[in-house]
Every structure is written in C-alpha cells, then in structure tokens.
Amino acid sequence: MERNSRKVLQGRVISDNLKKTITVLVETYKNHPLYKKRVKYSKKYLAHDEQNQAHIGDKVSIMETRPLSKTKHFRLIEVIEKAIG
C-alpha cells in the first residue's frame, strides 16, 4: 500500500456559507450483518474551496489533506455535476 494514499470521497454540497469552505454530505451504504438489509449512513465533512466554485446542490469530489483548521481536513478536487437551477 502506498504511504501517502489519501481518501477521495464524493458527495453533495449542503452549505457554502463560510468563506472558502463548503460542507459536503457523503452517503455510504452497508449491509447489516444479521438482517442483510442495506443501511444508509451519512456523514458531513468540511472541505476547503479556494476559488469558491462549488455551490449548494453540486456533486463534488473531495480529497483528504493536512489539517487546515480544527475541523477542516479535506479539500475540493473537482465539481462533478452542477446543481440545476
């Protein structure tokens, strides 16, 4: 395994109110071990957006990086799909 491998996640922007920061909601699905039902888990991440190019509703890709603040450990890689409207 590569030493500097970093997590790359995809999710939807749910907030862009902060300067150069977006809040991204990442949803994952896992099978329950006993009941075999597919369960949805979601988690919010703060990500650095230097050019303020992502807006609410956009589908984005974020990558793990060094800590940029107390809660911000990801940065925006690209906007995959723009929100309609």
Swiss-Prot record:
GO CC field: cytosolic small ribosomal subunit
MF GO annotations: rRNA binding; structural constituent of ribosome
Alphabetized UniProt keyword annotations: Ribonucleoprotein, Ribosomal protein, RNA-binding, rRNA-binding
Gene Ontology process terms (BP): translation
Pfam families: Ribosomal_S17
Matches recorded under Gene3D superfamilies: Nucleic acid-binding proteins
Keyword set includes Iron-sulfur: no
Protein family: Belongs to the universal ribosomal protein uS17 family.
Record's subunit section: Part of the 30S ribosomal subunit.
Protein role: One of the primary rRNA binding proteins, it binds specifically to the 5'-end of 16S ribosomal RNA.
NCBIfam families, alphabetized: PRK05610.1, uS17_bact
Protein name: Small ribosomal subunit protein uS17
Organism: Spiroplasma citri
